[in-house]
């Protein structure tokens, strides 16, 4: 039970990542008050966000860029430019753990993780806040078939991933490595 609570707390702590670039360290953080309302740390006013769920580093969006022969970083550059131009101040992603982990939950340093780092860096440059769900617990295929990756989530069904001792150990290893990961940008 303590492991589950620790895992939940870790995930919640990662939920809202303050998008601060190196030039601007004074961007306020967000906290949740006693009534469950997100507030800015500097003004105590309610924090509200308008954003997009965007998945180019992973799954079908990643593959689609490959099918079309489009440079993925150039696509991220263009898309983030338009997010900012449209006044979006938030970005959300479910990280496809099946694409950045192995069967034991080790974090894989691969193109998917590198593109996620790049995307986060570009969003931070534009002052766009980032909301991360650390894992998906589903495949990377939609609308196509799932692609085999060797990620731990593929070894357990969606319910067992939350109750099987080996699945929980793999998740703990993955989350710990993800939290310790340093963005290469």
What are these regions (language model features)?
Residues 1-2, 19:
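Extreme N-termini of proteins with methionine-enriched Sec-type signal peptides or N-terminal signal-anchor
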Residues 2-8:
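Sec-dependent signal peptide recognition
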Residues 6, 15, 57:
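Residue-level marker of positions within ordered structural domains that often coincide
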Residues 8-9, 98:
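A periodicity- and composition-biased signal for non-globular, repetitive helical segments
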Residues 10-18:
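Hydrophobic h-region of N-terminal signal peptides that target proteins for export
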Residues 20-24:
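Low-complexity, Pro/Thr/Ser/Gly/Ala-rich linker/spacer regions in secreted
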Residues 25-185:
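Active-site mouth of glycoside hydrolases
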């Amino acid at each position: 039970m303590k492991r589950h609570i620790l895992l939940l707390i870790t995930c919640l702590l990662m939920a809202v990542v303050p998008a601060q670039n190196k030039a601007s360290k004074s961007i306020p953080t967000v906290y949740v008050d006693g009534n469950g309302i997100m507030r800015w740390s500097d003004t105590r006013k309610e924090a509200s966000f308008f954003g997009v769920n965007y998945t180019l580093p992973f799954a079908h969006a990643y593959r689609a860029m490959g099918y079309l022969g489009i440079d993925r970083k150039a696509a991220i550059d263009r898309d983030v430019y338009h997010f900012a131009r449209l006044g979006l101040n938030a970005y959300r992603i479910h990280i496809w753990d099946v694409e950045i982990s192995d069967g034991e939950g080790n974090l894989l340093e691969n193109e998917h993780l590198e593109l996620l780092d790049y995307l986060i860096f570009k969003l931070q440059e534009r002052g766009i806040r980032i909301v991360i769900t650390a894992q998906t617990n589903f495949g990377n295929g939609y609308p196509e078939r799932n692609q085999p990756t060797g990620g731990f989530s593929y070894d357990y069904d969606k319910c067992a991933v939350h109750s099987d001792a080996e699945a929980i150990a793999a998740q703990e290893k993955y989350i710990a490595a993800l939290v310790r990961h340093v963005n290469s940008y």
